[in-house]
């Protein structure tokens, strides 16, 4: 573990890693500070970076598996202790590192008896195993195990559907996110006129926290570059013939009437610090803002694929704690 004393720059804005450690092959931790910042800037940067870290960084995962002799997902294969479903769940957890673009094929060819681990996966040159000891299956008899794998580099969360089943292969719910969690905190100093941003990052080992921070920052910059190159003369001009003047009273009334709705629309769900699973399931269901969330009932949420009652309870707890809001059991 590497830990440094926190010193605050009083001149140039700069990032600094103040703590770094490797808890295991699949768990890296890093803590960073950014200073000095003007009051309010730390929260703006922290929220944007957390969203980019959790949602915008690409990762590599196994997304499809094909067995030579499996009748269905919940069947068993003679000579293998695990069921097909258990093998799929073990393959889902395999952490990969790559500079892959799109998809590629891999395979497992193993003769029992013995333990099949991630080390036994035959990979293309541009894909690596992060933890070669990850367990896949235990062959108890001298049988041949042949498995075809589809590997994909993507971002976010891939949820299998019935439409994904093809050619006797089995799709896997894939979590592409290399960043397992990210938190930020803000500390004031200098008569509370300046701020320090603390950012904590946990990764699965396919990227270091420093690499993840670099990629998230680069992705944010890429999003804003088009605005920097936008030429004023190319902007659409307002059509003065179709404008309607509003009195100050009318403007005030409309703003007051929609104030609450506007505030809910401007608060995105990534700012609520939901766990990655809840965040991605909500996003897949086209729930992006707090207003979108409040337009659903508890019954609506429980119908979301892969959602459990515990997930709904966690959402209700966060809404109650931070906003004194609740969701109805149903909208009828």
UniProtKB/Swiss-Prot annotation:
GO biological process, one term: DNA-templated transcription
Keywords assigned: DNA-directed RNA polymerase, Nucleotidyltransferase, Plastid, Transcription, Transferase
UniProt GO molecular function: DNA binding; DNA-directed RNA polymerase activity; protein dimerization activity
Main location, first listed in the record: plastid
Top-level taxon in the UniProt lineage: Eukaryota
Ranges for region Alpha C-terminal domain (alpha-CTD): 262-332
Localization terms from the record: Plastid
Catalytic activity: RNA(n) + a ribonucleoside 5'-triphosphate = RNA(n+1) + diphosphate
One Pfam entry name: RNA_pol_L
Region (Alpha N-terminal domain (alpha-NTD)): 1-231
Keyword Transcription carried by entry: yes
GO cellular component: DNA-directed RNA polymerase complex; mitochondrion; plastid
E.C. numbers: 2.7.7.6
Metal-binding among keywords: no
Domain notes: The N-terminal domain is essential for RNAP assembly and basal transcription, whereas the C-terminal domain is involved in interaction with transcriptional regulators and with upstream promoter elements.
Self-association state and partner proteins as the record states: In plastids the minimal PEP RNA polymerase catalytic core is composed of four subunits: alpha, beta, beta', and beta''. When a (nuclear-encoded) sigma factor is associated with the core the holoenzyme is formed, which can initiate transcription.
Role of this protein: DNA-dependent RNA polymerase catalyzes the transcription of DNA into RNA using the four ribonucleoside triphosphates as substrates.
Protein family (similarity comment): Belongs to the RNA polymerase alpha chain family.
Protein name: DNA-directed RNA polymerase subunit alpha
Gene this protein is translated from: rpoA
């Amino acid at each position: 573990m590497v830990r440094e004393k926190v010193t605050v720059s009083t001149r140039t804005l700069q990032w600094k890693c103040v703590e770094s450690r490797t808890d295991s092959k699949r768990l890296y931790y890093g803590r960073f500070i950014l200073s000095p910042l003007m009051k309010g800037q730390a929260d703006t940067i922290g929220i944007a970076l957390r969203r980019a870290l959790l949602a915008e960084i690409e990762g590599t995962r196994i997304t499809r598996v094909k067995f030579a002799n499996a009748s269905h997902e919940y069947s068993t294969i003679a000579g293998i202790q695990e069921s097909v479903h258990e093998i799929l769940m073990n393959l889902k957890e395999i952490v990969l590192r790559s500079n892959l673009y799109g998809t590629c094929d891999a395979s497992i060819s193993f003769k029992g008896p013995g333990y099949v681990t991630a080390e036994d996966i035959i990979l293309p040159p541009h894909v690596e195993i992060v933890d070669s000891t990850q367990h896949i299956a235990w062959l108890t008899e001298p049988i041949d195990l042949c498995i075809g794998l589809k590997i994909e580099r993507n971002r976010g969360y891939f949820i299998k559907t019935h439409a994904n089943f093809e050619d006797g292969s089995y799709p896997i719910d894939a979590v592409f996110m290399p960043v397992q969690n990210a938190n930020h905190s803000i500390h004031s100093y200098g008569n509370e006129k300046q701020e320090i941003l603390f950012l904590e990052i946990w990764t699965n080992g396919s990227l270091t926290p420093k690499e993840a921070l670099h990629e998230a920052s680069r992705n944010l910059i890429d999003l804003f570059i088009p605005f920097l190159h936008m030429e004023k003369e190319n902007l659409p001009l307002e059509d003065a013939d179709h404008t309607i003047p509003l009195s100050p009273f009318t403007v005030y009334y409309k703003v007051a009437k929609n104030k609450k709705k506007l505030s809910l629309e401007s608060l995105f769900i990534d700012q609520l610090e939901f766990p990655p699973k809840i965040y991605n399931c909500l996003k897949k269901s086209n729930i992006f803002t707090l207003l979108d969330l409040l337009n659903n009932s508890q019954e609506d949420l429980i119908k979301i694929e892969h959602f459990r009652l515990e997930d709904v309870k966690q959402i209700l707890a966060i809404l109650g704690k931070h906003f004194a809001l609740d969701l109805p059991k149903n909208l009828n």
